Amino acid sequence: MEHGGDIYGNKNIDLDFSVNLSPIGPPREVTGAILDGELQGLLTRYPDPMYRELRRALSRKPELPEEWILCGNGASELLMAVVQAVRPKRAMIPVPSYQGYERVLEAVGAGILFYELKREQGFALTEDFLESADGLKRLADGLKTEEPRAAQSGAMLFLCNPNNPVGKCIEPELLNKIAEYCRENHIFLVVDECYMDLVPDARHKSMRRALAENPYLIIVDAFTKTYAMPGIRLGYMMLSSADLRRAVQMQQPEWSVSMFAQRAGLAALGSEGYLHEARQAVRAEREYVCERLREMGMEVFDGEAPFVMFFSRKELYGPLKEKGILIRRCDGIRGVRGSSEEGGHYYRIGLRSHEENIRLMRMIEELLDQ
């Protein structure tokens, strides 16, 4: 499966815009924690397998019971673990979306239903998803069960909020309706909020407030995107169902969160003012990049995330790569694989510093002028 950030297979890359991270880089506190001499002295110890200190700190962030939080070696591990725990007969993914959901569902042999988001609606999830015959109702048909036990559920729904690669958040009112529908129809709802902390008004748009009333709701998040630390694999999952938590933990290896990851996570959570600064940077740089791309005649899709998706009839990936700049061409993502009729491609660029974003825009402009 293709991901952004494959700098190891692409030599001589100077600027990597193919990954979606906080544009201001990791917090100073994280760098300090990793370089701390005290941590080097802990190399001979096993990490806390229950990551108690980290879980306690995480519970204060969304104000949840500590026991509702599970941590893992990145969000990817947790997505695989929850799918292996539930083993759904079938699942639904609105597309375009993150490709990793398909991978974990294929691993357990689940039948995957795809709901195509419409380009003319900016690839936004709308009320049609609830009302149309090919939407959520198609997943619920004949799959009702009695209890929210992992082994008894036949269905899962995956939503990425804000959505990757588009960058758009689901309207909170619609998301609440979807969550309630899933609860009533015994469908496990996985909401991927790995970019949520970087969007404006994140608290209002997050589904964490609904966990207490919905045992079928599962929220996944990660330090990777929010704190720009993908090299330290650290993700977490929030869910209120005790049965499902036990089932997920049975799928995880022991000590899945290293000592380095636990210390880095604690340092990130303790970085005062970081999220406010990161959100301001995302808003400003997104506005700048979208404006410049539109001035060049690109079709740019609205969103709030730290990345921008656009459509270009001009080939950009190869020429930019030759200049040492890596962007994401979305040809491998279901729903945005380009258009043979138009002869173009969808691209996604992660936001970086203002100076780096200026450099990318100038490079694209030069290519268009050729």
Regions found by a protein language model. Name each.
Residues 173, 333-370:
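PLP-dependent enzyme catalytic core of the Aspartate aminotransferase-like
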Residues 59-81, 94:
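Short loop-beta-helix segment that forms the pyridoxal 5′-phosphate
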Residues 85-106, 111:
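Conserved PLP-anchoring active-site segment centered on the Schiff-base-forming lysine
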Residues 25-27, 100, 216-301:
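PLP-dependent aminotransferase class I/II
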Residues 108, 184-185, 214, 296:
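Helix C-cap/helix->beta junction micro-motif
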Residues 119-199:
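Active-site phosphate-binding strand-loop segment of PLP-dependent enzymes
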Residues 1-45, 141:
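N-terminal "arm"/small-domain region of PLP-dependent enzymes with the aminotransferase-like
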Residues 295-324:
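Conserved PLP-binding catalytic core of the aspartate aminotransferase-like
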